[in-house]
């Protein structure tokens, strides 16, 4: 019942977050016309240069693009979201057109990342199926730990790989054993040991002599990974690491030669012969620092497109293909560098509309610091 002395600082803070029920604004531009009193010529006002010609502003354009590229929504789902969450009614054609407009302004950012990739010491490359209408096409990707660049192409052959990587790559390219990469010089191509392990596991799970040699080859690959992990964690000196790797390489080749002759299945014999033929490509990491043993980086980056592909109906035009490869390049690069792709896209749209300096990746990173 006595007086209460209230402390200056609160003992508890309770915050409630909410979003506005009306989350959009409309700016109407009224254009007038008039007639010349002397020649009767009609003169019509035009929109200012810094006003979007379409019905969507920069924030809405960026939102629509991110719903596709980052959150893998189909056009129908985006249409439903705009209606349900914001009360905005746009046709599927208008949403598709908005994606095309975003794609057009992303060209400089996309080309900048693609050119930067050619200067990286080590890159990863992989491809996956892509659908355009009723045609089966391919989504290619080259990436590093900090960059990703996607490209759609009708071919899965060397022609497409050259378009993405260049005719004579000077960097080290980590790939699987696919023949489309055979044009790359053996000194600049590292085969993925995870793919090799997968193939050898299949051999070990077979029967007869297949199982015998497959089990031995799998054991050698696991020793390879253990040695690499110990070396990277500084538990093994460089000299001991190289000595053990050299012995392992000799044992690996001996077992492959035996398996290529004695496996009971021609399929596995040929697989072992192919590894013998490409033996130099398996060991490039020994002569170049920083070359990983696997192509897991590319497979992780491609997963974003695989998820998008599963939840949508593909594309039906060249414009749709360009949008996918460019928006995925922006989104995946931002993910790897912990940047906000929505903010970068807004900055690009704003700079394009106002004809100011275009923010490339390095410019946007500098602005975020």
Regions found by a protein language model. Give the residues of each.
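Short Cys/His-rich Zn2+-coordinating modules
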Residues: 12-24
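Short linear motifs in intrinsically disordered/low-complexity regions
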Residues: 4, 8, 19, 355, ...
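Catalytic center-proximal scaffold of phosphoryl-transfer enzymes
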Residues: 28-35, 40-369
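Short Cys/His-rich metal-coordination motifs, predominantly Zn2+-binding knuckles/fingers
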Residues: 1-3, 22, 37-41
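Short Cys/His-rich "knuckle" micro-motifs
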Residues: 2-11, 45-49
């Amino acid at each position: 019942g006595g007086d209460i002395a209230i402390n200056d600082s609160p003992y508890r803070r309770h915050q409630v977050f909410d979003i506005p029920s009306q989350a959009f604004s409309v700016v109407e531009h009224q254009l007038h016309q008039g007639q010349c009193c002397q020649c009767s010529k009609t003169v019509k006002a035009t929109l200012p240069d810094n006003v979007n010609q379409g019905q969507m502003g920069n924030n809405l354009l960026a939102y629509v693009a991110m719903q596709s590229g980052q959150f893998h929504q189909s056009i129908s789902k985006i249409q439903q979201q705009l209606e349900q969450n914001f009360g905005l009614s746009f046709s599927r054609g208008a949403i598709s057109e908005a994606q095309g407009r975003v794609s057009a302004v992303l060209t400089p950012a996309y080309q900048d990342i693609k050119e930067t990739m050619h200067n990286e010491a080590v890159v990863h490359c992989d491809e996956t199926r892509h659908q355009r209408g009723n045609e089966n096409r391919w989504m290619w990707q080259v990436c590093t730990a900090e960059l990703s660049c996607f490209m759609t192409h009708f071919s899965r052959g060397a022609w497409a790989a050259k378009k993405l990587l260049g005719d004579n790559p000077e960097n080290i390219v980590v790939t699987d054993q696919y023949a489309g990469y055979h044009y790359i010089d053996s000194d600049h191509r590292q085969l993925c040991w995870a793919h090799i392990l997968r193939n050898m596991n299949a051999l070990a799970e077979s029967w007869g002599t297949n199982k015998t040699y497959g089990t031995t080859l799998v054991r050698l690959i696991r020793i390879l990974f253990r040695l690499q992990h110990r070396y990277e964690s500084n538990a093994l000196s460089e000299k001991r690491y190289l000595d053990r790797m050299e012995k392992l390489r000799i044992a690996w080749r001996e077992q492959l030669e035996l398996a290529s002759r004695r496996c009971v299945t021609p399929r596995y014999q040929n697989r072992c012969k192919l590894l013998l033929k490409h033996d130099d490509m398996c060991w490039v990491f020994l002569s170049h620092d920083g070359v990983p043993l696997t192509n897991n980086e590319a497979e992780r980056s491609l997963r974003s497109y695989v998820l998008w592909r599963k939840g949508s109906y593909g594309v039906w035009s060249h414009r749709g293909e360009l949008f996918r490869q460019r928006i995925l390049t922006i989104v995946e690069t931002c993910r790897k560098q912990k940047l906000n792709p929505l903010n970068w896209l807004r900055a690009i749209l704003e700079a394009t509309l106002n004809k100011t300096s275009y923010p490339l990746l390095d410019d946007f990173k500098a602005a975020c610091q």
